Amino acid sequence: MDPENKKSATGAAAILDLDPDFEPQSRPRSCTWPLPRPDLATEPHEPSEVEPSLGQKVPTEGHSEPILLPSRLPEPAGGPQPGILGAVTGPRKGGSRRNAWGNQSYAELISQAIESAPEKRLTLAQIYEWMVRTVPYFKDKGDSNSSAGWKNSIRHNLSLHSKFIKVHNEATGKSSWWMLNPDGGKGGKAPRRRAASMDSSSKLLRGRSKGPKKKPSVLPAPPEGATPRSPLGHFAKWSSSPCPRNREEADVWTTFRPRSSSNASTVSTRLSPMRPESEVLAEEEMPASASSYAGGVPPTLSEDLELLDGLNLASPHSLLSRSGLSGFSLQHPGLAGPLHSYGASLFGPIDGSLSAGEGCFSSSQSLEALLTSDTPPPPADVLMTQVDPILSQAPTLLLLGGMPSSSKLGTGVSLCPTPLEGPGPSNLVPNLSVMAPPPVMAGAPIPKVLGTPVLASPTEDSSHDRMPQDLDLDMYMENLECDMDNIISDLMDGEGLDFNFEPDP
């Protein structure tokens, strides 16, 4: 920097520092910078020269010191001043200029290019060529390095504006023609073509049909009080069961008869995955009072009872051997003492022996009589137990056990939760529910219990009213007489039903 300019910059900085109370001057809103003040000049001069318009030059004499105005101050050595930097760059351009090449947009330039063609159509390369040849701004930007930006903008405008249409070029190896829309098109941009075509595109429909068909790992639980009417509800409850069923087979299950809606019709000796005990306790709880049992027999229980129709059970004496299955124990409600659990048997043995006349069913009332009877059997003669679950995809195992009429339960009934406690595989079983209704509930229905509560009598009557020592499910399965063709044809077509009459090793 020469000494004269350096001196001028120093003087301008000093003048600005000496006037700390500089207040903005009133000016029209269209003016960006304030008009120069006369007191900032270094020497007297005419007012007409002091207050020039923003785009005019200040006349100066060759022998005199140049007039220092805020719009003409050189840049100080300490850094650019905000008000000085904008004025040094040159006069302010007109506000009507929208782009670097003028006031016309890309779409207007493209329209001019197409209209200038004899056939009123141009290819994309011809539009590029017209831009470089006609518009001065693009004359030096025709090479590949400097033309990437504006050529990309032209392609966007051709695609997004409805005033341009693309016509197929019949010549081999030629790009398509771009023409002006004869209908005029809209002034603004057309909606994106991809978004407009997605709704009616067959490609989208194919994409939807090819979506993942895996069953959800966590299925919503049915609302409280809802009763499942088909095995599909149980399958949703036990989503991790080995049987490969999912929601897509709902239409298959709806055509079956009502008796197939119970899980007891699925015969298998394999244990299914079971839910944690906390989930069972939270979802299904025993009502606190016996008055809530008023009404008829629950529909689900009726369907479960229908399922046992036609099944001939083995002799009670053949069911006393030890079972190879694991995980359950049972205690008669009338017995005192701790609840025993054994990992190697289905029902834990009870001290003492059964008399020859005692078995799973009473001699006075057979299973067929219980099932075909219109009225519910006397509560004192029926013992219902429920295991949740024991069969594959069958959370319900319904057993009807006869109790001698001499074993009369007391009128006082207490609810006592008795969760199963046992080592080994028995921990997989959440709960075993035993219900023996007292005579006072003879008119009440028999509810379906899935939780832990047990209706037990406070009276400890008789040492001979006990359950069988063990119930061998393998023996039960081997001696089961049923119409296998009927079960297979009703339940499924050979996929998930696992009939295995061989005892597990």
Swiss-Prot record:
Region (Disordered) residue spans: 1-66, 175-244, 257-276
Modified residues annotated as Phosphoserine in this record: S197, S262
Broad class of where this protein is predominantly found: cytoplasm
InterPro entries: FH_FOXO4, Fork_head_dom, FOXO-TAD, TF_fork_head_CS_2, WH-like_DNA-bd_sf, WH_DNA-bd_sf
Gene3D superfamilies per the UniProt record, alphabetical: Winged helix-like DNA-binding domain superfamily/Winged helix DNA-binding domain
GO biological process, one term: negative regulation of smooth muscle cell differentiation
Stretches the record annotates as Required for interaction with FOXK1: 97-215
Record's GO cellular component terms: cytosol; nuclear speck; nucleoplasm; nucleus
Tissue-by-tissue expression: Strongly expressed in brown adipose tissue and weakly in white adipose tissue (at protein level). Expressed in skeletal muscle.
Xref: SUPFAM superfamilies: Winged helix' DNA-binding domain (SSF46785)
DNA-binding region as annotated in the record: 100-188
GO molecular function, one term: DNA-binding transcription activator activity, RNA polymerase II-specific
Keywords per UniProt: Acetylation, Activator, Cell cycle, Cytoplasm, Developmental protein, Differentiation, DNA-binding, Myogenesis, Nucleus, Phosphoprotein, Transcription, Transcription regulation, Ubl conjugation
Positions with biased composition (Basic residues): 205-216
UniProt PTM: Acetylation by CREBBP/CBP is induced by oxidative stress and inhibits transcriptional activity. Deacetylation by SIRT1 is NAD-dependent and stimulates transcriptional activity.
Highest taxon, organism lineage: Eukaryota
Stimuli inducing this protein: By artery ligation in proliferating neointimal smooth muscle cells.
Biased composition (Polar residues): 257-271
Positions of post-translational Phosphothreonine modification: T32
Entry's localization field: Cytoplasm; Nucleus
Assembly and interaction partners: Interacts with CREBBP/CBP, MYOCD, SIRT1, SRF and YWHAZ. Acetylated by CREBBP/CBP and deacetylated by SIRT1. Binding of YWHAZ inhibits DNA-binding. Interacts with USP7; the interaction is enhanced in presence of hydrogen peroxide and occurs independently of TP53. Interacts with NLK, and this inhibits monoubiquitination and transcriptional activity. Interacts with FOXK1; the interaction inhibits MEF2C transactivation activity.
Task of the protein: Transcription factor involved in the regulation of the insulin signaling pathway. Binds to insulin-response elements (IREs) and can activate transcription of IGFBP1. Down-regulates expression of HIF1A and suppresses hypoxia-induced transcriptional activation of HIF1A-modulated genes. Also involved in negative regulation of the cell cycle. Involved in increased proteasome activity in embryonic stem cells (ESCs) by activating expression of PSMD11 in ESCs, leading to enhanced assembly of the 26S proteasome, followed by higher proteasome activity.
UniProt-recorded name of the protein: Forkhead box protein O4
Organism classification: Eukaryota, Metazoa, Chordata, Craniata, Vertebrata
